Amino acid sequence: MSLNKINFEKLKNIGNMDIKELVKIASKKQVKFKKKDKIPKSVVTLDIGEKYIKIVSGKFLKDKLIIDDCIEAETPKNSIIDGKISNKYMLKEALVNIIDEAGLSGKSAVVTTNSSQIINREVIIPKVEESELETVIRYEIQKYLPINLNNYEIQYIFKEIIINDNNENWVLSVIAFPKNIVKEYYDFLEEINLNPYALDITYNSIRKIYNHSFKKDMQGTVAFIDMGVESANVSIFKEGKIDFTRIIKNGKSGIGLLESYYRVERKKLYIDELTKELERVFKYYSNKNVGNKIERILIYGGISNVKDLKEYLENQLNINVEKISDINNVEFIGKRSKDVMKNKIELYLNAIGAVIRY
């Protein structure tokens, strides 16, 4: 089989797509996000967490990223659980007026989220015809995971070619996104007067902002850690490409770190627990392949603001740690967005990255 029978450019482009915008929902009708050939001039992005929601209005034109507005809203209690909408009515009540007052109604919208229900696996498959790819991928996933793949939307990112015993194999990063979550967000965006355009996952959002703002200054293997209230999302980049992702669910809520900062013992217990989980993740990554070594850690998200966290992680992990406090190659317009640039950029990286559309 000749390599030119496979459109590798198409496979690589899939790596620049979000978790599929064209989704067939397991219901009576098909629910579709807008097609990629109609990229809007500007978008509204929503990074919906269990404690806070970040809303960003911006545009990505000719490799220029412009942020017009940044808004923070509190997520109603128990309305988002593990990336799923559990109380649509409370969430709608919290957001619909904010969207309207900010003049965002009717704009194309992108949601960036994460969930332990999203399956992310690296698979190695033999060289096959392009038309056979999804069938082979589904077969490989089904071998290891006892799930009904008909309930998932499958997306794959081509990573590299490897040769074993003169046989060519492909390494793919495969993401399986529950279709019911896609439908929930699609319906929700319509109900808050936004035009559903795309559904993203947080590690893909950070991958895009990494490529746009950090890649030129990064060498070796770098771990980005989104330190949220209920979970930490780890994205590891190796030689400029995303190589590994993992969600760490917090055994104890990090809300106490933000609302009851004086509770020293609770804070220490939480940070100790998180650090141990990070050690396990990094050890697993290092053991995956010879030469996998984390050389630098960048932290962001709400919990990254905990006093002395950077120094503590450095001492425990023996790796250089930096808190993200600015990003390159981004223009901020408007009072609120300029304030975010100066004081809160670490809270908005996922939402800003989701503005980037290819």
Stretch-by-stretch model annotation:
Residues 1-358:
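Hydrophobic/aromatic-enriched cytosolic interaction surfaces used to assemble or bind macromolecules
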